[in-house]
């Protein structure tokens, strides 16, 4: 039974703009510069700010009054950490998050993030219960794989990503709609430079962090930029030409943004 198409999020479109789309190597260098002695940031600081950005984007597009149940799907790396942080903020924003986190990151940071969620009473669903959690969700936050993902998708992530890809094969009770998907930085299993070459799922909303990735050029849904922490000298070093964030916002919509004219000849 195919799902009916979910309503489009009620976000206002931003004016067309140009900014730099970056590859995985540049994204890695930006993170390294931020966490260097001269950059001064720690990983948990960047993760906190990134997760807050993601939670705010979800709130702007899918408010808790209409979309209270969020399934936060987390991977074992830093991308998953962003999702854990986002789940905490979503709880405080009035949502009822459920976390799918089948493979925990190895450092103490991930353990502490998980403890924070347990202390709020957030439920964690088992590895095999992804589909059941999906049936109850109003929104899915995809924070499984980030810009460092390479190779084939393996379990325990392969089956859930296949479910999202072939959602029309699932039959929900009471004719529930397939929930919209919000992806963090790059949709899980997309190639960071080439885009959806693996024919994976396509989210409704994408939240690029620091700067949009080259693989997002073909993304046609709602597109946000988050991670309001880059100093001006770092933006200039990589010629990112990022837009200004309004007021106290942690995200800015960049739907329809084009690459810099100096990039177009190479794309």
From Swiss-Prot:
PROSITE patterns: YJEF_N
Keywords recorded for this protein, A-Z: Cytoplasm, Isomerase, Metal-binding, Mitochondrion, NAD, NADP, Nucleotide-binding, Potassium
Sites where the protein binds (6S)-NADPHX: 78-82, 146-152, 185
Cellular component aspect of the GO annotation: mitochondrion
Protein origin, superkingdom: Eukaryota
Catalysed conversion reaction: (6R)-NADHX = (6S)-NADHX; (6R)-NADPHX = (6S)-NADPHX
Cofactor(s) in the UniProt record: K(+)
InterPro entries: YjeF_N_dom (IPR004443), YjeF_N_dom_sf (IPR036652), YJEFN_prot_NAXE-like (IPR032976)
Protein's UniProt keywords contain Nucleotide-binding: yes
Subcellular location: Cytoplasm; Mitochondrion
Domain YjeF N-terminal: 27-242
EC assignment: 5.1.99.6
Protein residues bound to K(+): 79, 142, 188
PANTHER family membership: NAD(P)H-HYDRATE EPIMERASE
Function: Catalyzes the epimerization of the S- and R-forms of NAD(P)HX, a damaged form of NAD(P)H that is a result of enzymatic or heat-dependent hydration. This is a prerequisite for the S-specific NAD(P)H-hydrate dehydratase to allow the repair of both epimers of NAD(P)HX.
Name used for this protein in its record: NAD(P)H-hydrate epimerase
UniProt organism field: Mycosarcoma maydis (Corn smut fungus)
Record lineage: Eukaryota, Fungi, Dikarya, Basidiomycota, Ustilaginomycotina
């Amino acid at each position: 039974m195919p799902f009916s198409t979910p309503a489009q999020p009620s976000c206002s479109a931003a004016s067309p703009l140009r900014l730099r789309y970056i590859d995985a190597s540049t994204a890695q260098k930006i993170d390294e510069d931020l966490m260097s002695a001269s950059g001064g940031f720690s990983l948990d600081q960047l993760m906190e700010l990134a997760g807050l950005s993601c939670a705010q984007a979800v709130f702007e597009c899918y408010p808790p009054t209409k979309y209270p149940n969020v399934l936060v799907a987390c991977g074992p790396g830093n991308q998953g950490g962003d999702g854990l942080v986002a789940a905490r903020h979503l709880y405080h924003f009035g949502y009822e998050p459920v976390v799918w986190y089948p493979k925990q990151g190895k450092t103490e940071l991930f353990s502490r993030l998980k403890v924070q969620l347990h202390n709020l009473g957030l439920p964690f669903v088992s590895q095999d219960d992804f589909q059941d959690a999906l049936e109850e969700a109003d929104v899915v936050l995809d924070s499984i794989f980030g810009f460092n993902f390479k190779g084939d998708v393996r379990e325990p992530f392969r089956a859930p990503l296949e479910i999202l890809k072939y959602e029309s094969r699932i039959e929900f009770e009471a004719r529930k709609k397939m929930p919209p998907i919000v992806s963090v930085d790059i949709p899980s299993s997309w190639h960071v430079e080439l885009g959806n070459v693996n024919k994976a799922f396509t989210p409704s909303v994408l939240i690029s962090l620091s700067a949009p990735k080259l693989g997002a050029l073909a993304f046609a849904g709602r597109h946000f930029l988050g991670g309001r922490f880059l100093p001006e000298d770092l933006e200039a070093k990589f010629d990112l030409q990022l837009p200004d964030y309004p007021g106290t916002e942690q995200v800015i919509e960049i739907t329809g943004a084009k690459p810099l004219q100096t990039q177009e000849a190479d794309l």
